[in-house]
């Protein structure tokens, strides 16, 4: 089917194809044309232009009137924990009362709280709850999403989570990437026996995940009070044996070796980075691993923001993601994430847009097909209400601006 989108005030995030990520100064370029049209065939972008340069084609099956709105590529959210068993607002109050993330975890809250609740829920209940959140983020402009396990912390429950993620991928129009995060914390029954738990992850969980083809990637929480660089290396090596490349939660709580171990294993991304050092930034220059910042986490936990401005100035690419989860970021609103990146990390709007689209896609190994408006890419985009400029999107940080959303050329 041929779909024409016309009457576009600004068509933003365009490229001619072949752009897989943007680094350093390139991130300040978020190309756009005005008074434009775009043609989609069978869910794939085929061409676009300005009406002044070339009239829109007429031999189409359907026309969508953008009504003077801006068309943007859908957000690519490369770090979420959207499958979970319930909210944790009691811990929200604990944080207000001064308890730290680590103190809440030691009291049996945090990740272990979510694991206990998930154990009691059926796969169907988990799926139904997660799909509500998936529909929510689609409506807010997200078109590709990474979803992690990590609230199971035993083999059966980790597999249950990953089967839910697979079902979301099979039944939802959003593009889903699945990541196994059995090493999110030490399961409660392994308290005081972290080495035995790592053995379980390596010898039982990863082979079981691979046998069912349930995950694209393997992630580890490599940070102070969680898993050591040595344990992380062992888990990532086990994943690679089954074709699952690594991703890392690192440098969130302290400079604890996460960046170094990510680079050692050529991890696809290293995420959080609130405690990233100048030495870490220097180590990452010229490497393939995508630094990924999670500004919503810093906002919600009232902790320092990752030094993204330094990273970009050093020539690095940067992605930003929501970290949607019940404990530290109960929101998947990528528009707000973009606003936070501008306000708190001092990114220019264009830099934040690139971090949330093409670089987010790269952090999921999806940028060949997603993350920009380009011929040959999947037609994932949203149409805004008429706005004065694309800078209005992060400026009006709570204003609903999305009018219509499309995934693979189909309106949602």
Model-derived features with residue positions:
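Divalent metal-coordination and catalytic microenvironments
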Residues: 8, 38, 43, 68, ...
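Metal-associated gating/positioning segment near the N- to mid-region
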Residues: 63-129
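Active-site-adjacent C-terminal substructures of enzyme catalytic domains
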Residues: 245, 255-372, 384-388, 397, ...
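C-terminal cap of metal-dependent C-N hydrolases
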Residues: 19-27, 358, 378-412
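N-terminal metal-binding scaffold of metallo-dependent hydrolase/deaminase domains
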Residues: 1-57
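Conserved beta-strand scaffold positions in the cores of enzyme catalytic domains, especially
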Residues: 4, 61-65, 178, 405
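Metal-coordinating catalytic core of metallo-dependent amide/deamination hydrolases
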Residues: 114-129, 135, 143-256
């Amino acid at each position: 089917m041929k779909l024409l989108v016309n009457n576009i005030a600004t068509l933003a995030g365009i490229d001619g194809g072949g752009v897989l990520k943007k680094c350093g100064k390139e991130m300040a370029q978020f190309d756009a044309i005005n008074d434009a049209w775009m043609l989609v065939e069978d869910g794939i972008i085929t061409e676009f232009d300005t009406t002044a340069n070339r009239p829109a084609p007429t031999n189409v099956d359907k026309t969508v009137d953008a009504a003077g709105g801006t068309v943007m590529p859908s957000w690519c959210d490369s770090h979420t924990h959207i499958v979970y068993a319930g909210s944790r607002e009691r811990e929200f109050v604990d944080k207000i009362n001064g308890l730290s993330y680590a103190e809440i975890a030691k009291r049996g809250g945090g990740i272990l709280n979510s694991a206990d609740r998930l154990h009691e829920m059926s796969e169907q209940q988990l799926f139904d709850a997660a799909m509500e959140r998936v529909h929510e983020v689609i409506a807010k402009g997200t078109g590709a999403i990474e979803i992690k396990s990590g609230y199971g912390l035993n083999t059966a429950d980790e597999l249950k989570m990953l089967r839910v993620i697979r079902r979301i991928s099979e039944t939802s129009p959003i593009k889903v990437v699945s990541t196994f995060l059995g090493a999110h914390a030490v399961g409660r029954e392994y308290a005081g026996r972290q080495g035995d738990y790592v053995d379980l992850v390596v010898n039982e969980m990863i082979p079981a995940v691979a046998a069912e083809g349930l995950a694209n990637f393997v992630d580890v929480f490599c940070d102070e009070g969680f898993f050591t660089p040595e344990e992380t290396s062992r888990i990532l090596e086990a994943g690679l044996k089954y074709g699952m490349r690594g991703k890392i939660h690192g440098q969130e709580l302290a400079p604890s070796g996460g960046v170094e171990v990510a680079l050692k294993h050529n991890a696809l991304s290293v995420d959080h980075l609130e405690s990233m050092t100048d030495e870490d930034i220097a180590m990452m220059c010229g490497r393939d691993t995508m630094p990924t910042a999670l500004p919503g986490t810093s906002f919600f936990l009232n902790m320092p923001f990752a030094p993204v401005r330094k990273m970009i100035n050093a020539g690095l690419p940067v992605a930003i993601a929501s970290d949607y989860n019940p404990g530290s970021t109960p929101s998947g609103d990528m528009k707000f994430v973009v606003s936070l990146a501008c306000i708190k990390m001092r990114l220019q709007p264009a830099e934040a847009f690139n971090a949330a689209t093409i670089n987010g896609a790269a952090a999921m190994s999806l940028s060949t097909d997603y993350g920009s408006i380009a011929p040959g890419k999947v037609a994932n985009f949203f149409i805004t209400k008429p706005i004065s400029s694309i800078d209005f999107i992060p400026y009006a940080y709570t204003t609903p601006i999305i009018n219509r959303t499309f995934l693979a050329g189909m309106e949602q």
